[in-house]
Design a protein with these regions (language model features):
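SAM/dcSAM-binding transferase cores
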Residues: 2-18, 34-38, 53-56, 198-259
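The AdoMet/dcAdoMet-binding core of the Class I SAM-like
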Residues: 6, 21, 42-163, 170-180, ...
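General small-molecule cofactor/ligand-binding pocket signal
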Residues: 17, 108-110, 191-193
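A short, structured beta-strand/loop element
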Residues: 21-36
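N-terminal cap/recognition module
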Residues: 32-46
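Flexible loop residues that form catalytic
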Residues: 133, 194-195, 210
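Short catalytic-loop micro-motif centered on adjacent basic/acidic residues
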Residues: 163-165, 192
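Conserved S-adenosyl-L-methionine
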Residues: 187-198
Length: 259
């Protein structure tokens, strides 16, 4: 593994690494891996392929991605969806995504906070993908009832859905369940796709038009690691989220969870 670019951005140190043997590229920010992909920009992260597979089921054609990283999901969706919009606070992410991860220049990119972008826009989407992190945490304001209601107001009323990536360190980490609980204040249909028993995993919280969604399959295999991705997708399962959280004041905009 070699470092092919290193820079200090407003949001911390960024490193782009390359595996010489397999021609794989990795985007690391402040010590956390944000993206990993093959030379064609196809992601090596199973949760990205899960999101891609779920979007295919709802035939989403107009999609907003909040959070760019290396932009591998945008690269993959750019080949199929009619309109992709990506929002990220870090302008360097877009340059890196285009230079190393194959993000098409035709994809609309905005340097902005996801919530502020939605407040300034009247557009409604088929799907909104939330994959934004400060270090290893979802930004606090994106973990609120007000934020979810804002997202809901920008989704197509009949087919729109939210898909959110929520990191879990282990089975006792309640972050995915907390996120689902807060989301349920804005949507009637909220589901959780997870892999129990895996340390340091990505769970997906789904809300909106998600009742008919099935477990996703690998649709766009990368040049390597396809079997590993398929194995992890096969282990994913929808599970009941633990609804034992109470909001102190759901209308306040804060997370306000009583655990």
């Amino acid at each position: 593994m070699i470092v092919i670019e290193k820079l200090n951005s407003e949001f911390g140190e960024i490193k782009i690494l390359k595996s010489r043997a397999e021609e794989l590229f990795f985007y690391m920010q402040e010590g956390y891996f944000q993206s990993e992909a093959d030379r064609n920009g196809i992601s090596l992260a199973p949760y990205v392929h899960a999101i891609y597979g779920l979007l295919a089921q709802v035939d989403a054609r107009d999609i907003l991605l909040i959070g760019c990283g290396g932009g591998s999901l945008g690269t993959m969706l750019g080949k199929t969806a009619s309109r992709i919009t990506i929002v990220d606070k870090n302008a360097e992410s877009f340059r890196i995504a285009r230079e190393y991860f194959g993000l098409p220049r035709t994809i609309e990119c905005h340097v902005a906070d996801g919530g502020e972008f939605l407040l300034s826009s009247g557009h409604c989407y088929d799907a909104i993908i939330l994959d934004a992190y400060d270090g290893d945490c979802i930004p606090e304001h994106m973990f609120t009832v007000d934020f979810f209601r804002l997202v809901r107001s920008h989704l197509d009323r009949t087919r729109g859905c939210l898909l959110a990536n929520v990191h879990a360190w282990h089975d006792l980490d309640r972050a995915p369940d907390q996120y689902a609980a807060v989301a349920s204040c804005a949507w009637n249909d909220v589901r959780l796709l997870d892999i129990r028993g895996v340390v340091g995993r990505n769970a997906l919280v789904l809300a909106g038009n998600v009742r008919a969604l099935r477990k996703p399959a690998l649709l766009v295999p990368p040049l390597s690691h396809g079997e590993e991705i398929t194995s992890e997708l096969n282990r994913m399962a929808f599970r009941s989220w633990r609804n034992h959280f109470k909001l102190r004041n759901p209308g306040s905009g804060g997370r306000g969870l009583l655990l």
